[in-house]
């Protein structure tokens, strides 16, 4: 992987729970827990579009709007996330380095999916598998967790945008 054309980019990553003080029983009600679950790093890796092309993956038509990827981590819960092919072809990378050095275990060593503009949970750590398909996957992480409750009581899944919630000065 490291022999392929690589790129380095600076990105912000933010936990979807940042500012989540409405949760009951927060252990330590500090600024770090209230607004500090984010960071800015330089990631180095191979653009996912380059990998998909090298593998001969069918990216679909209409700029990838009709295809999806499944990213799976090798962590204890086998964290999985569905990402639209359109997003995957845009700015997503498979990173092996952070801030000029190899990823550390706490940051997803040996590989991490970097997905700018979405919740940090979609930046799959310990990446072990990427699959391409024609519809989103119904994994436990996208059916039971990380869904958005709508005013009408329905749930929205596969949320792909993380609005800015924090200010850094």
Describe each PLM feature range.
Residues 33, 40-44, 63, 105-107:
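Short, glycine/acidic-rich beta->alpha junctions
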Residues 6, 10, 25, 53-169:
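Extended, aromatic/histidine-rich regions of cofactor-dependent oxidoreductases associated
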Residues 1-5:
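Short Gly/aromatic-enriched secondary-structure transition segments
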Residues 36, 46-47, 84:
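Secondary-structure junction/capping motif
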Residues 6-40:
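Short, conserved helix/loop micro-motifs enriched in His/Cys and acidic residues
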Residues 44-47, 51, 123:
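Stable alpha-helical elements in mature extracytoplasmic
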């Amino acid at each position: 992987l490291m022999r392929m054309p690589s790129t380095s980019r600076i990105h912000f990553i933010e936990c979807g729970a940042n500012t989540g003080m409405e949760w009951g029983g927060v252990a330590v009600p500090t600024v770090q827990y209230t607004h500090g679950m984010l960071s800015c790093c330089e990631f180095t890796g191979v653009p996912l579009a380059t990998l998909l092309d090298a593998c001969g993956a069918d990216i679909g038509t209409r700029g990838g709007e009709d295809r999806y990827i499944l990213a799976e981590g090798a962590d204890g819960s086998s964290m999985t996330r569905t990402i639209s092919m359109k997003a995957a072809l845009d700015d997503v990378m498979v990173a092996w380095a952070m801030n000029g050095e190899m990823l550390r275990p706490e940051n997803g060593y040996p590989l991490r999916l970097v997905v700018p503009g979405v919740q940090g949970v979609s930046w799959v750590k310990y990446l072990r598998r990427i699959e391409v398909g024609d519809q989103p996957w119904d994994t436990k992480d996208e059916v039971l967790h990380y869904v958005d409750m709508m005013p009408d009581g329905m749930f929205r899944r596969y949320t792909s945008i993380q609005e800015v919630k924090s200010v850094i000065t």
